[in-house]
């Protein structure tokens, strides 16, 4: 009797586990559109991404990779220019498009969005300092255009 009762209880417990263990949650169907919206060259795209980054929990169902090494081996704030957030968004684009298997098709736009972000940083400065910032931004942009692909292939992001 005890053996039979133990078997029935074990079977009931397993049924409960199976019943509550439902299928793994898939990312929402609009994930590619959200990713695209957050990686465009416009200020609106940048601002939407910054807002989402500040509230990542609201986007957890999408499974985005928010990790960043900022500007990789380059200074995050060269000569005092705050490029860190632009680098973080660039990393976001590289990492998530690589995970989606569509990095090659989007790399150029991601690099252009990075440059647009850097230019927006530079726009806040007066003529002389802006020229220096713009020159530094151009250098960072050329670096990601030239070396971003190889870095994305080996698992790091160059931003």
Regions found by a protein language model. Name each.
Residues 2-9, 16, 20-159:
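Extended terminal accessory/targeting regions
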């Amino acid at each position: 009797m005890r053996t039979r009762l133990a078997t029935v209880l074990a079977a009931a417990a397993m049924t409960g586990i199976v019943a509550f263990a439902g299928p793994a949650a898939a990312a929402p169907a609009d994930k590619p559109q959200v990713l695209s919206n957050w990686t465009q060259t416009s200020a609106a795209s940048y601002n939407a991404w910054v807002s989402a980054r500040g509230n990542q929990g609201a986007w957890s169902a999408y499974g985005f990779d928010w990790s960043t090494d900022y500007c990789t081996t380059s200074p995050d704030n060269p000569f005092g220019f705050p490029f860190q957030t632009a680098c973080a968004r660039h990393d976001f684009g590289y990492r998530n498009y690589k995970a989606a298997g569509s990095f090659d098709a989007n790399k150029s736009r991601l690099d252009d969005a990075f440059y647009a972000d850097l230019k927006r940083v530079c726009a806040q400065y007066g003529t002389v300092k802006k020229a220096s910032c713009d020159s530094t931004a151009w250098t960072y942009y050329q670096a990601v255009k030239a070396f971003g692909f190889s870095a994305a292939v080996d698992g790091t992001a160059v931003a």
